[in-house]
């Protein structure tokens, strides 16, 4: 019993000492990046971008469950450089190769929210396009609103912006320390959160594949091999071959991934929503000379207004 009480006392002292170490910080999850130029204190957005924050934290603490075996069990960011620095724009790091093309061995989806690149000190994910996040991140020197909707903002500098502004190319990340203040931050399990993201993504992928398989089996096929299913029947007139029609669309890969859509709700459901583009029906002609994909035109000719 004395042993148990001693362990409990040690735990309480540890929690209190963590709180006293950074008394100026409000409750939340923080990352202190120690660089060759000084320290940068960042607050991470675990409520709005839990997956991106979990990725960063688990890499920093060395318990990310998805990293390439070469990085397994290692504090990923220690010793890496800021490989890309652009004056009056941003500093970028997190690439183990130092070239801008390296990563942890996996990619994950964007978490686009109302968080904006609205000033200096914004922490955001570098990427090579939609759904290509890995380990590379950048911190802004100034407002960069053209990046909104394209890069996931997941934190901000609360102390050390002068250090950010002083960073030069090839300066080093010495260490990244994660600081948990308050109950919610302490119970945020980054490794488990990130692992569960991939498990759920796999489950959704399997569900989509099964749904597509069922759809193929119930489809009606034309002589050309086009398969179609009318899920909702309208009461309008048939599509006329000599007229322009307005139509919504959603195009998928065979494995169930979304390629493109004109429907906002579908774009959001597949985490491909782009606030910079309109979501509205497109005009289409279905005659033989129209510059549309043949199968798309054939499918439209089988429909009526409202289908």
Residues covered by each model-derived region:
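Bacterial Sec-dependent N-terminal signal peptides
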Residues: 1-25
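Cross-family detector of peptidyl-prolyl cis-trans isomerase
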Residues: 18-307
């Amino acid at each position: 019993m004395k042993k148990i009480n001693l362990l409990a006392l040690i735990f309480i002292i540890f929690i209190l000492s963590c709180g006293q170490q950074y008394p100026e910080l409000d409750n939340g999850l923080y990352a202190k990046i120690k660089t060759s130029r000084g320290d940068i204190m960042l607050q991470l957005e675990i409520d709005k971008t839990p997956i991106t924050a979990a990725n960063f934290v688990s890499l920093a603490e060395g318990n990310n469950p998805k990293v390439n075996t070469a990085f397994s069990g290692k504090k990923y960011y220690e010793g890496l450089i800021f490989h890309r620095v652009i004056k009056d724009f941003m500093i970028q790091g997190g690439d183990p190769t130092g070239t801008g093309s390296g990563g942890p061995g996996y990619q994950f989806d964007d978490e686009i929210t109302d968080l904006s690149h609205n000033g200096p000190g914004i922490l955001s994910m570098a990427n090579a396009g939609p759904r290509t996040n890995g380990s590379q991140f950048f911190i802004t020197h100034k407002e960069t609103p053209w990046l909104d909707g394209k890069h996931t903002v997941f934190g901000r500098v609360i102390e050390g912006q002068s250090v950010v502004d002083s960073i030069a190319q090839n300066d080093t990340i010495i260490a990244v320390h994660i600081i948990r203040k308050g109950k919610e931050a302490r119970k945020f399990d980054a490794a488990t959160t990130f692992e569960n993201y991939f498990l759920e993504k796999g489950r959704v992928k399997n569900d989509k594949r099964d749904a597509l398989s069922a759809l193929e089996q119930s489809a009606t096929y034309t002589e050309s091999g086009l398969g179609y299913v009318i899920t909702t029947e309208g009461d309008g007139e048939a599509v006329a071959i000599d007229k322009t029609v307005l139509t919504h669309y959603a195009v998928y890969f065979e494995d169930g991934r979304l390629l493109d859509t004109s429907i906002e709700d579908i774009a959001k459901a597949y985490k491909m929503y782009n606030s910079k583009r309109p979501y509205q029906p497109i005009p289409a002609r279905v005659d033989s000379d129209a510059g549309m994909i043949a199968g798309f035109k054939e499918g439209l000719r089988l429909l009526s207004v409202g289908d």
